[in-house]
Amino acid sequence: MDNNDQKGKGSDNGCCSAANGISRRDATRIISTVTAGACSGLSAPSIFGAKSLNFDAIHYATLSEVSELLGSREISSVELTEAQLARIDAVDAELHSYALVTAELALAQARQADREIAAGNRRGPLHGIPIAVKDLCYTQGVPTEGGLKVYENFLPPFDATVMTKLYEAGAVLLGKLNMTEGAMVGYHRDFEIPVNPWGANLFAGVSSSGSGVATAAGLCYASLGSDTGGSIRLPAMANGIVGMKPTYGRVSRYGVMPLAESLDHIGPMTRSVRDAAAVFQAIAGRDVNDPTSLSDEVPNILSRLDGDISSLRIGVDESFLRLGSPEGLVMAIQKVINTLQSIGATLVEVKMPGEFSQQLRDTWVTICSYEAHKAHAATYPSRANEYGEYFREFLHSGSEVSDSDYNAAGRERRRLNRIFENELSKVDAVVCPSGGVPFEIAPGAQYGGMDAISPVLSSMLPHNSMPADFAGTPTLTLPCGFSDEGVPYSVQLMGPRLGEEGICRLGYAYEQTMDWQTRHPAV
């Protein structure tokens, strides 16, 4: 069967039958051996000494910084890739961010990038850059499991559209990143829980936890995550990095394992706003294979990041800002607001639907569980025993949602969206928390069922994250300080539909006044 035939069978965005292939555990063993051989005896190239650049810390450089070095041929993609593989080998045994390291593939792609760049055929800012992706993006011939035992050893017959776009941009794939089971909240016991590099006792976010940890710890220069109720923004918050959830339909979901098709978004996770804009521009755009894909032109955000922000408006709702948030975080976000005003942005008072937080959460659970149950119809309940405790219970709850209940939830969603979108229409960004602060969590707690994990959900302050998934509007999460204990604080900029440029310009302008992006965990 050729690739086109396989694509037809995969048009449900990912939940096809698991294919036979090499086991994930065997692949990890084989690839680790390749990594050790590729990275032995790694030494710093002389250009770093000449330019007073610290090669030992290049893993914490931004994507944009190393992209400049690649473009000027002051470093090669192979050197960068070998350095990243060596760091993964040295550090990730404790952090568990990677589900699979694709060393051989990465080095082959890096060699190709070096040849093209040397020939004057540089494709753009991602060319030769080592990146990683959440393990729900189809990668042809490379295991993709989505944190699901039921998809163990699944070898996708084609690449997700986002992977095709990354490859076309010349990116180098370091590997696939760990995540919660099925992109929900709990983990299957056969999978490792990624460890927050700021503190092993701290929540690492869900569900793109591996993406957040790897990006924060300098184990890739950018990663992809998915967001259904906050799953890009919460790990970005927890790990002190930048996370961007684009407008629904801006980035194709084709070839991405679904959680809930009307809520799922794919977006970049990086160490700077400029980097997020670069990855967004590479992966966004119309895709005929995704019926929800938008035909709107993708803006060239990178060319306008440095622009004046005096024409931009920021919305603030003091009561919404404070709802459930600790005082330290509130103060940090107020400083963001003051800074944006001081450099030209106009403050506008808005009224966010904070009083509907319980209705919002209940409606989200109804819609998400119903759609998740439909997405897993091929394997649940027929293989229910292969699911982890939490996700099995979540799918069961979805099986009890009637079509009538789902339709009623859809009407409530549209009502809440009208309130939310009306306020967003007044501004370029609403400034608010992205989901609280990283909190302490007991080891292994996320292996439990719904009752055990419910307190975790509440601690994430879902009223800050769920509205943008409901409405499909873009948001940007970025660091805005640290607590006295050294825990990262983050702020969220929630924009109107297709408002990626505005939130990135505001985020970039704020970022230039601070040094949060230069502070990294001690790993």
Where are these regions (language model features)?
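Acyltransferase
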Residues: 77-82, 111-114, 327-353, 377-382, ...
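N-terminal secretory signal peptides
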Residues: 1-23
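Structural helix-boundary/capping segments
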Residues: 90, 168, 172, 216-323, ...
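Conserved hydrophobic/aromatic pocket- or pore-lining residues that grip, position, or stack substrates
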Residues: 84, 106, 128, 134, ...
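Short glycine/serine-rich loop/turn segments
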Residues: 126-266, 319, 434-454
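Short, well-ordered alpha-helical
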Residues: 15-16, 21, 26, 30-152, ...
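Small-aliphatic-rich amphipathic alpha-helix that forms the alpha element of a beta-alpha
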Residues: 421, 453-479
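Short helix-loop capping/hinge segments that flank enzyme active sites or metal/cofactor-binding pockets
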Residues: 126-146, 303-317, 348, 366-421, ...
